[in-house]
């Protein structure tokens, strides 16, 4: 099958198509992970994006449902240097997602690094793609909106409340689902924390009706500035009970506290991002997937930076300055402590979430 990748600057990249025979538009990004293509493709945070893998070989260890981070592929398309085996091809076909192989992913990555993320179109076809078609495809890319103009969270958030009960419940969390990864839920449940997953646009009254001991605002796709409704809910919850966040959730908490976010040139996507804990000086290697960040020049009043990225000095964690009152506790991280895929250096943060919930539960009982 023929494959073609068309960039907004008119660049045409031809290769071998695999997966579904179709055409998609999206923001072209790169991921530096050496493994974990199943987790990456099924991560809801990739909604609206075509993912390029910098590691050259993909598909060599198959596909298993136990690795899924959601109910299916959420990325729009997949770009690899070499694709091996039939499982990855079948996987993309099952979810009607196109892929392209046999292309210079190093060239694509360097282009994104230099120019920034790029609007693009990926087309696969059993018929050769002509020069006349190329002109039409370029026009489609140029007319495609920037990802900041697309409201992506409603496409990946749960439509109804889902409860995950821990066998020996120690505490309960309401998770505001902006496109949560399954491994985040798993990390909480296995620590004795029952999780009530609610839609992104749930109001504080509904959230509090589940009697949570803390709230976690999840990861997800797109620009946090588009999510005024969720920000308002988070703002109303702060001071009522402990509030934590991961990735997009971190950005929403930043805005709720009075801070600002901005779009990164090419984002952080991969399992090898070094993060420094400002208090302890410890460095963690973390898994990340985000294209927006907290503006360190506008730290919300009453808050402080908690973690920083050692590659580019961007903000990786923020917290409300500690109070003796647990209900005022607020902290969030930009990276993914659950990994999925990636290192487990920061999974202790789930222990801290659960411990926070247990303490607040006891405080409520007194």
Swiss-Prot record:
Tell whether Ligase is among the UniProt keywords. Answer: yes
What's the top EC group for this one? ligase
Provide this UniProt record's keywords sorted from A to Z. Amino-acid biosynthesis, Arginine biosynthesis, ATP-binding, Glutamine amidotransferase, Ligase, Nucleotide-binding, Pyrimidine biosynthesis
Presence of keyword Kinase = no
The UniProt record lists the EC number as 6.3.5.5
- Residues annotated as binding L-glutamine are 45, 220, 222, 248, 251, 289, 291-292
Instruction: Outline the extent of the Glutamine amidotransferase type-1 domain.
Output: 172-363
PROSITE patterns per UniProt? GATASE_TYPE_1
Q: Which GO terms describe its molecular function?
A: ATP binding; carbamoyl-phosphate synthase (glutamine-hydrolyzing) activity; glutaminase activity
Q: Which residues form the active site?
A: 247, 336, 338
Q: What NCBIfam families does its record include?
A: CPSaseIIsmall, PRK12838.1
Q: Subunit composition?
A: Composed of two chains; the small (or glutamine) chain promotes the hydrolysis of glutamine to ammonia, which is used by the large (or ammonia) chain to synthesize carbamoyl phosphate. Tetramer of heterodimers (alpha,beta)4.
- Annotated family: Belongs to the CarA family.
Q: What does this protein do?
A: Small subunit of the glutamine-dependent carbamoyl phosphate synthetase (CPSase). CPSase catalyzes the formation of carbamoyl phosphate from the ammonia moiety of glutamine, carbonate, and phosphate donated by ATP, constituting the first step of 2 biosynthetic pathways, one leading to arginine and/or urea and the other to pyrimidine nucleotides. The small subunit (glutamine amidotransferase) binds and cleaves glutamine to supply the large subunit with the substrate ammonia.
Q: Which named protein is this? A: Carbamoyl phosphate synthase small chain
Species of provenance: Methanococcus maripaludis (strain C5 / ATCC BAA-1333)
